């Protein structure tokens, strides 16, 4: 009997070693990238973000409360980030399109010079998919200054101004404050509900595990989603 138990344990150890050495691979074809054939029934709001995690950090409470199509521009090359994003979309009941444009190239943040026009065309296509009730994206400052956030803002704003100014339905993520400044302004900021805050926090840390350090650095903003409506001429 002891010999059988020993052999079972040995087999389990060997199997574990094989799995660790050769982890399961997800085929890129299974990641559902650039799928524009999305069921948009009961979806009349669209959120456009640069990276997976921007959706929850800047608009998680809205995703929890409402039905959104979330468009993520980058990170299709990172299977871990694709799967994290899909898990978050499932957790919030959101529809999604992941466009698969580069976040980093050769270890450096991509400047989007070679894909800027393609991103613009995709955003044009997405905004034409429905008569959207609400469109939201990054603010002019890119929240804390991220260049991809700024470029996403510019692209969405440009497409909107050229085609949809009469809709009056474009919003930008709320103003970012540094952690050492938040106490000075928080009395003037509207907080999301405690229930949504707890759920938002849980989803971010449960699913966006690769971005824990980013989440830690921005967690002081999790309670605030003071989106600003776009005014023509701004």
Go through the PLM ranges and name each one:
Residues 2-166:
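Active-site beta-strand->loop->alpha-helix modules in alpha/beta enzyme cores, enriched
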Residues 6, 11-14, 166-234:
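The feature marks non-catalytic terminal segments
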């Amino acid at each position: 009997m002891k010999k059988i138990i020993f052999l079972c344990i040995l087999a389990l150890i060997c199997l574990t070693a094989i799995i660790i050495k050769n982890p399961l691979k997800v085929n890129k074809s299974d990641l559902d990238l650039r799928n524009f054939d999305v069921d948009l029934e009961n979806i009349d709001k669209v959120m456009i973000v640069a990276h997976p995690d921007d959706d929850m950090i800047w608009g998680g409470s809205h995703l929890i409360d409402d039905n959104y199509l979330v468009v993520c521009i980058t990170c299709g090359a990172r299977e871990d980030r694709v799967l994290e994003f899909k898990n978050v979309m499932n957790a919030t009941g959101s529809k999604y399109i992941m466009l698969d444009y580069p976040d980093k190239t050769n270890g450096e943040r991509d400047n989007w010079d070679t894909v800027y026009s393609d991103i613009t065309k995709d955003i044009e296509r997405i905004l034409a998919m429905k008569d959207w009730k609400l469109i939201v994206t990054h603010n002019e400052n890119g929240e804390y200054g991220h260049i991809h956030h700024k470029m996403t803002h510019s692209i969405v704003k440009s497409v909107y101004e050229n085609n949809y100014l009469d809709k009056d339905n474009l919003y930008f993520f709320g103003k970012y404050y540094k952690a050492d400044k938040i106490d000075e302004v928080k009395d003037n900021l509207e907080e999301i509900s405690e229930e949504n805050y707890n759920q938002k926090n849980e989803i971010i840390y449960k699913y966006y595990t690769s971005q824990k350090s980013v989440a830690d650095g921005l967690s002081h903003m999790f309670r605030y989603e003071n989106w600003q409506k776009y005014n023509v001429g701004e």
